[in-house]
Amino acid sequence: EADVKAALKEVKMALLEADVSFKVVKQFMKAVQERAVGQDVMSGLNPGQMVIKIVNEELVKLMGSETTELALRPGNEVTVIMMAGLQGAGKTTTAAKLAGKLKSKGRKPLLAACDVYRPAAIKQLQVNGEKQGVEVFTMGDKNSPVDIAKGAYEHAKNEKYNVLILDTAGRLHIDEDMMQELENIKAALPVDQTVLVVDAMTGQDAVNVAETFQNKVGIDGVILTKMDGDTRGGAALSIKAISGKPILYVGMGEKLSDLEQFYP
């Protein structure tokens, strides 16, 4: 019993040091503890090893053991993907990387510049889109994001694109206007996937962002950026645990090819 407790304490400290959110650590440890304390030590395993085995199983249960693909409509039907997230998470670059990835898989993607607030957001998307050889639909910054999204959707249908990726505005922090705008876009066209782009370096903050977006707008998956930095991976675990949504890709660097599938 004492050995089990010591091992559990070590696991708990390791998770907290990895920047996993406190709430998630608490829930996770409860699940592990319930199994560890009630279980006879399996032959050939010492209590410490047994705890590690349980932790491993619980982690797999939480994160899933499969990679998750973006669900795309068949054939020439247009799949609409709305990118959401805070400013500085790397949303615009990630939108272009995702378009490039889908293009390399034989899709015909169209990027739409729906961020009319941040100076140079449209230009940034155009530059990144060009690098990927993907067309960027823009109506300048005088139209509403909803109108731009609708225009892009019509354009995608007419020109036989089968994926439309909407680059929406980020804010420095979550506000009602931002959420409302995303909801308005969702109401105006058939958004298939809302993908949240989160900066993994923000650790605990990333979790709050994911939770709020999930509650307000609803998200279908997450892309974690800046995973090549000094991040300890805790954000991935916390976001999955709290939002219940899969992590689709991780951004591992600046290059457009650095968007990698997430392998739990």
Regions found by a protein language model. Give the residues of each.
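Short, small-residue-enriched loops and turns at beta-alpha junctions
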Residues: G88-A89, Y117-P119, N143-P145, G170-I174, ...
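Alpha-helical hydrophobic packing sites
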Residues: S21-K23, Y117, A169, M227-D230, ...
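Primarily NTPase-proximal linker/entry elements flanking Walker-type ATP/GTP-binding cores
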Residues: E1-C114, A121-D141, I148-T168
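Conserved phosphate-handling catalytic cores of large alpha/beta enzymes
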Residues: K150, Y161, H173, Q180-A187, ...
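Alpha-helix N-cap/helix-start motif
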Residues: K91, A95, A121-I122, D175-M178, ...
